[in-house]
């Protein structure tokens, strides 16, 4: 029996082993697989779900967080945490790190660049209402923590295998290669 890359190379159903020479070809294969899996009816439904999910979350959060663009959105919405930072010292980075402590992958931070303390939230089309509600609840809880115990968020994440790194130190003194132990 064949294992690993041997199976890819020798299996007549396979496209073969992928090499870096082909650039983003694997991304195209994944996209094609996604399109073929969803089909003609599934693509519009997935798109509608992405838009619905983003608008649902945005409307559940806009009473606390400042929306950069407070109007119906497409598949993403942008929050500005500039007011929260001025009031509490908690940045978009702190909220993102707090999300990690709660088992949620953080949204895109500091983009778009024209929005101060931006968090760009893109809930995917496959998220259930329950997971969206959980994310909203966590974001609301983090806002409350920002107002009552900012230091807790400045220390986050504390439950992940790798805790918050010294970003200034990492930028000024980069460690770019691993030293193997003999």
List each model region and its residues.
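Short, small-residue-biased leader/transition segments that mark boundaries at the very start
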Residues: 2-9
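Non-catalytic terminal extensions of PLP-dependent enzymes
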Residues: 11-12, 35-182
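A structural-propensity feature for long, helix-poor, extended segments
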Residues: 14-17
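PLP-dependent aminotransferase class I/II
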Residues: 19-32
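Short hydrophobic/aromatic-rich motifs at helix boundaries and adjacent loops
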Residues: 5, 29-31, 68-69
């Amino acid at each position: 029996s064949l294992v690993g890359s041997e199976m890819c190379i020798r299996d007549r159903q396979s496209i073969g082993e992928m090499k870096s020479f082909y650039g983003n070809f694997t991304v195209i294969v994944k996209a094609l697989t996604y399109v073929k899996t969803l089909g003609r009816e599934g693509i519009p439904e997935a798109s509608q779900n992405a838009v619905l999910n983003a608008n649902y979350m945005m409307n559940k959060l806009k009473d606390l967080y400042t929306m950069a663009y407070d109007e119906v959105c497409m598949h993403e919405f942008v929050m500005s945490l500039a007011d929260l930072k001025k009031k509490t010292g908690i940045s978009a980075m702190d909220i993102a790190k707090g999300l990690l402590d709660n088992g949620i992958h953080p949204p895109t931070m500091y983009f778009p660049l024209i929005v101060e303390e931006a968090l760009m939230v893109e809930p995917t089309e496959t998220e259930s209402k329950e997971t969206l509600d959980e994310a909203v609840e966590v974001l609301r809880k983090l806002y409350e923590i920002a107002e009552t115990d900012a230091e807790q968020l400045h220390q986050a994440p504390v439950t992940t295998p790798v805790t918050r790194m010294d970003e200034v130190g990492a930028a000024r003194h980069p460690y770019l290669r691993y030293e193997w132990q003999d």
